[in-house]
Curated annotation (Swiss-Prot):
NCBIfam families for the chain: PRK01222.1-7 (NF002300)
Catalysed reaction equations from the record: N-(5-phospho-beta-D-ribosyl)anthranilate = 1-(2-carboxyphenylamino)-1-deoxy-D-ribulose 5-phosphate
Keyword entries, A-Z: Amino-acid biosynthesis, Aromatic amino acid biosynthesis, Isomerase, Tryptophan biosynthesis
Catalytic EC class: isomerase
Family, per entry: In the N-terminal section; belongs to the TrpF family. To B.subtilis YnaI in the C-terminal section.
GO molecular function, one term: phosphoribosylanthranilate isomerase activity
InterPro entries to which the protein is assigned, alphabetical: Aldolase_TIM, PRAI_dom, RibuloseP-bd_barrel, TrpF_fam
Protein name per its UniProtKB record: N-(5'-phosphoribosyl)anthranilate isomerase
Species annotation: Lactococcus lactis subsp. lactis (strain IL1403) (Streptococcus lactis)
EC numbers on record: 5.3.1.24
Length: 351
């Protein structure tokens, strides 16, 4: 789940958002009480990891102004809140998020990330969620408008296929970003997203169990189950015994029955709406992290579904290896999770 905090204007708020685990930082570059200059954006984000995306928000600005701001602020995406059409968007050599009202026509915006917002963006007013039907929607989309730490979990539950959630005034007090609200919003969004992913993992596990396969849950979703700490997992990381990969066509057929499409044969990755599932061989853990899969003996049963889960010590070895892995992205997140695992290990040692 992507989590975006918008309307940022201070280094303190940016740092808090990044440390809390956001994926996107939003900055208003058009006239607004939250407006910030491109030069200041560059200044307050100079040490933000590349894995956290900087989004510039514009409303019907001249295209040259937007292009200049992208260059100066070193933006990763732009978010358009005006009447910009595809002719306008096609002039931008950058990923675009297009904000629209739930009752607005959006068929022309192919291959554009959508952001469903209230008619008055940044007002703190929510729109009627029931008025928006997203089943069958091919575009990735954010939900915005009136979100806050108290209702973001309900929003994620209501829109399980959402690409992300976006908040601005919902993490403010008297028009100023509230650092505690930012932390609470990110934590609540992360926990709600993880719950949705875990439910989906159990659906997949049920199918695997029916074929006499017991999967190994790995990655940040596994860590959240182990130490009960929000990690905002991006996907479902499943490992299987090599023998279970021998009939990959059967595995592909199984995933297709659950609504997934194979998007990367080499990496064994599947996709359904905003959910990504990756499969790998659990035997590779020994060379990668010094973890013999035969020692992963923690077996869990959830609603009758059976799966394996690494313990804290094994997870520490895996994330220590991930931190050294030059091919992996998300280094900051790996380090963050590693630090939390260290804390959990110390707590266990003191008990």
């Amino acid at each position: 789940m992507k989590i975006k905090i918008c309307g940022l204007s201070t280094k303190e708020a940016v740092d808090t958002a990044v440390e809390s685990g956001v994926t996107h930082l939003g900055f208003i570059l058009s006239p607004s009480k939250r407006q910030v200059a491109p030069e200041k954006i560059l200044q307050i984000t100079n040490d933000v990891p590349k894995t956290v995306k900087k989004v510039g928000v514009f409303v019907d600005e001249p295209i040259d102004f937007v292009k200049k701001a992208i260059q100066v602020a070193q933006l990763d995406l732009v978010q358009l809140h005006g009447n910009e059409d595809m002719n306008y968007i096609n002039q931008l050599d950058i990923s675009v998020i297009k904000a629209i009202r739930p009752d607005q026509e959006f068929k022309e915006y192919e291959d554009v990330i959508l952001l469903f917002d209230s008619p008055q963006a940044g007002s703190g007013q929510a729109f009627d969620w029931d008025s928006l039907v997203t089943s069958g929607l091919k575009n990735k989309f954010f939900i915005a408008g009136g979100l806050n730490p108290e209702n973001v979990a309900a929003a994620i539950q209501h829109f399980p296929n959402a690409y992300g959630v976006d908040v601005s005034s919902g993490v403010e007090t008297d028009g100023i970003k509230n650092l505690t609200k930012i932390k609470n919003f990110v934590q609540n969004a992360s926990l709600a997203s993880s719950k949705q992913l875990f439910i989906e993992f159990l659906r997949i596990t049920k199918k695997l169990n029916e074929n006499k396969i017991i999967p190994y849950l790995m990655g940040s979703l596994a860590v959240e189950q182990i130490i009960n700490f929000p990690t905002n997992p991006d996907d479902i990381d499943i490992q299987l015994k090599t023998s279970d990969f021998e009939n990959f066509e059967q595995l592909t057929s199984l995933m297709e029955k659950l609504g997934y499409q194979l998007i990367d044969l080499h990496e064994h990755k599947f996709e359904k709406a905003s959910i990504h599932v990756g499969f790998a061989s659990v035997e590779t853990l020994k060379n990668y992290a010094g973890v013999d899969y035969l020692t992963i003996q923690q077996e869990r049963m959830e609603n009758g579904e059976k799966y394996h889960l690494p313990n804290v010590e094994q997870s520490l070895k895996i994330y220590e290896a991930a931190k050294r892995d030059e091919w992996r992205g998300g280094k900051q997140k790996d380090s963050f999770i590693f630090d939390e695992l260290i804390k959990e290990q110390k707590r266990n040692d003191n008990e």
